[in-house]
Amino acid sequence: MPFAAGQTYLFPLGSQLCHLWIIATEPDENGMFATVNFTSLKGANDQTVIIRAGEHRFVKWDTCVQYGLGELTSTERLQEFVDAGTAKMHHPIRADLVKLIVDGFDCSDFTKRRVREFVQARKTAARSQNG
């Protein structure tokens, strides 16, 4: 299954820690992409980007992006999780929310440096491809 920015998945299935994760960047030439999850706004330390109830069909109450848990992963690894039943693809998010989330990697004090640098490189590559 090809993966793309804006797709979402539930992970890890069967766990109380299961969250909705977002593929934030297009995969690079090695299949690597940045991913980040939504978490409850209540009590969250990082409120850089807030997603309001109803902005995605999974979001039933105000939610925020948890940049501190943002990671780099590969299309191969996500496919392994899907095949093993520990992840399940969900409905994609709107393009404007993807942009907001991607911009938040730079703004959040909680983003890991390697993740921030990867996202910046992917944004630069996307601008180069689009002229």
Where are the predicted features?
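Short beta-strand or tight-loop elements
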Residues: 5-7, 17-19, 63
